[in-house]
Amino acid sequence: MENKLKIIFLDRNTVGPFELKDIFSKYGEYTEFNLTNDDDVASYLKDYDVVILNRIKLGKKEFEQAKHLKLVLLTGTGFNHIDLVAAKEHGVSIANVAGYSTNSVSQLTMTFLLNELTKVEKLSQKVKENKWNELSINMDNYYHVDTEDKILGILGYGNIGQKVAEYAESFGMKVMVAKIPGRKYTDNSDNRYDLDEVLEKCDIFSIHAPLTDLTKDLINLDRMKKMKKSAIILNLGRGPIINEDDLYYALKNNIIASAATDVMTTEPPKNDCKLLELDNFTVTPHLAWKSQKSLERLFAAIENNLNLFLENKLIGVESK
């Protein structure tokens, strides 16, 4: 390669123990930082042609100072942390990766769903507290709920939403796909239902939508009040799709039964996050996407995006 690139990975620790130097050093000079403070991002970018990142935010200030930057390679699907307008103004292409973690995210969704219905986590904890006999005699609060004939509402019907629907139907569940209010659908949306109707009828509501102006705070207290008291909310989309103050109120006051999420509005959540105090709230640290198979597919796709860029064939999220 005649013109060697200068490539930097700003938050390499977010993808785990996966060897990357051999992949990217053949394109030029490769540098990686385990994590980067937000205040340091702009200064690191100024000398590099390509930046790889997962959760680092890039705004107007960062693009203004990144005089040599040509390409941002995202190690994921979401891009709400990137100022696409500023990127375009400064001639920087943005490339994300879709579909690499469909199976792993769908698996965690079903893990959440089954855990909420069978109470495995809570039962295990009770046994560890030496309450086996108590549970065997009095199961009033810990009986299993069958999946058969339960209704799963899905918000966001891309690769992951469709895979979750497939899994759910194999467990005997009925699936209702919700429309995002205000969104125009170009595909056949006859099999989609109004959001409020889905919320009223579903037993479990699973979120797999991206964060946009239309989905931010979409699931608020007014909408949760439309749901059954026995309803369960799962969020494997983006944290701000649910208003977390409203979710806390709904869980605390038994407006809905429980919630499980892999994403939060602030990640990691602050120490005083009230949701973390609740027994009917389950959270994992935004790791639904991270399986070994997913990582292999992810970095193969990222390298492919880099090659497409070098061949002037990149489409990406935004392209010059």
Where are these regions (language model features)?
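N-terminal glycine-/charge-rich "phosphate-binding" loop or analogous flexible N-terminal tail
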Residues: 1-48, 176
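Short beta->alpha connector loops at strand-helix junctions that form conserved
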Residues: 34, 75-76, 92-103, 179, ...
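Rossmann-like adenosine-cofactor binding region
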Residues: 59-63, 181-274
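Phosphate-binding beta-alpha-beta segment of Rossmann-like dinucleotide-binding domains, i.e.
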Residues: 90, 98-151
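Hydrophobic/small residue at the entry helix of a nucleotide-binding pocket
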Residues: 160
